[in-house]
């Protein structure tokens, strides 16, 4: 058995099974290598979407940096075997070097760059991340950082937007109207998870504070908002407000819809509320879809 010098890293590697590279016969320079993806012939079908998922990249959402989880895709013509996926990362990196602000204008520019690099007519992106914002306690006005999950979706054909949407998931308090009605005192309440997917007007700019307006519709119609910091006067206010505003899941999604339908920059929306029931082992949920 061969003895290796265990005092060196290379010796230890070989001791644990590493071997020297073989003398290869295939090209080692890019220009000499076969580019299978660029093969052109009849491959039977055009592909609507091909790309990458679960790409994690730093992004800025308003004042805070967070981790964005991206899904990118482009079309693929029938006479092309595949796409060059490394060009997707190159397109993202180009815009990251300029500071990757997570908004529709930036995503549009990334997709246009992607189309050029990939030589394709259509492209799309979905990216999700934590949206952080200031949240003040209701009585003592103490500032802390709240958060919600946001997902942007954008797709373009040539230079025209074909899909423009944003999804926000936030947590609220819901107090049971039935429990309040039948009980001598108190009522059970729980955390509700509200998800709103908004289909935005593709042909016009949305208002600057669209995320805040959507989140306000989700939270203000609940029994109570959730706060990072609550002192005793705040807790009293939150508890009493919830009791004054009981909500079934059905109530909540209808009230949210009534607010959203008034915005002229919204073409439609999907709403779901899921209550993590405090007196059951199951959850309660309700869904609603609306298109103008």
UniProtKB/Swiss-Prot annotation:
<comment type="similarity">
    <text>Belongs to the GTP cyclohydrolase IV family.</text>
</comment>
<dbReference type="Pfam" id="PF02649">
    <property type="entry name" value="GCHY-1"/>
</dbReference>
<comment type="pathway">
    <text>Cofactor biosynthesis; 7,8-dihydroneopterin triphosphate biosynthesis; 7,8-dihydroneopterin triphosphate from GTP: step 1/1.</text>
</comment>
<dbReference type="InterPro" id="IPR003801">
    <property type="entry name" value="GTP_cyclohydrolase_FolE2/MptA"/>
</dbReference>
<dbReference type="InterPro" id="IPR022838">
    <property type="entry name" value="GTP_cyclohydrolase_FolE2"/>
</dbReference>
<dbReference type="GO" id="GO:0003934">
    <property type="term" value="F:GTP cyclohydrolase I activity"/>
</dbReference>
<keyword id="KW-0378">Hydrolase</keyword>
<protein>
    <recommendedName>
        <fullName>GTP cyclohydrolase FolE2</fullName>
        <ecNumber>3.5.4.16</ecNumber>
    </recommendedName>
</protein>
<comment type="function">
    <text>Converts GTP to 7,8-dihydroneopterin triphosphate.</text>
</comment>
<dbReference type="GO" id="GO:0046654">
    <property type="term" value="P:tetrahydrofolate biosynthetic process"/>
</dbReference>
<feature type="site" description="May be catalytically important">
    <location>
        <position position="176"/>
    </location>
</feature>
């Amino acid at each position: 058995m061969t003895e290796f010098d265990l005092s060196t890293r290379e010796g230890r590697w070989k001791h644990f099974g590493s071997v020297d590279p073989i003398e290869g016969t295939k090209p080692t320079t890019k220009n000499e290598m076969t580019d299978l993806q660029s093969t052109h012939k009849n491959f039977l079908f055009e592909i609507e979407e091909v790309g990458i998922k679960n790409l994690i990249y730093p992004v800025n959402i308003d004042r805070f940096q967070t981790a964005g989880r991206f899904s990118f895709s482009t079309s693929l013509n029938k006479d092309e075997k595949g796409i060059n996926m490394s060009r997707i990362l190159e397109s993202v990196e180009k815009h990251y070097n300029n500071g990757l602000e997570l908004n529709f204008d930036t995503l549009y520019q990334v997709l246009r760059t992607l189309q050029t690099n990939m030589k394709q007519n259509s492209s799309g992106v979905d990216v999700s991340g934590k949206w952080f914002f200031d949240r003040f306690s209701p009585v003592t006005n103490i500032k802390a950082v709240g958060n919600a999950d946001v997902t942007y979706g954008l797709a373009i054909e040539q230079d025209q937007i074909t899909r423009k949407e944003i999804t926000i998931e936030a947590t609220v308090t819901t107090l049971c109207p039935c429990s309040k009605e039948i009980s001598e005192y108190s009522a059970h309440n729980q955390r509700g998870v509200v998800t709103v997917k908004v289909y935005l007007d593709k042909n016009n700019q949305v208002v600057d504070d669209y995320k805040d307006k959507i989140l306000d519709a989700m939270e203000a119609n609940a029994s109570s908002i959730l706060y990072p910091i609550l002192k005793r006067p705040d807790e009293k206010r939150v508890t009493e407000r919830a009791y004054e505003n009981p909500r079934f899941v059905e109530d909540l999604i209808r009230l949210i819809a009534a607010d959203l339908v008034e915005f002229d920059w919204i073409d439609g929306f999907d709403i779901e509320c899921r209550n993590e029931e405090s007196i059951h082992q199951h959850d309660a949920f309700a869904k609603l879809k609306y298109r103008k």
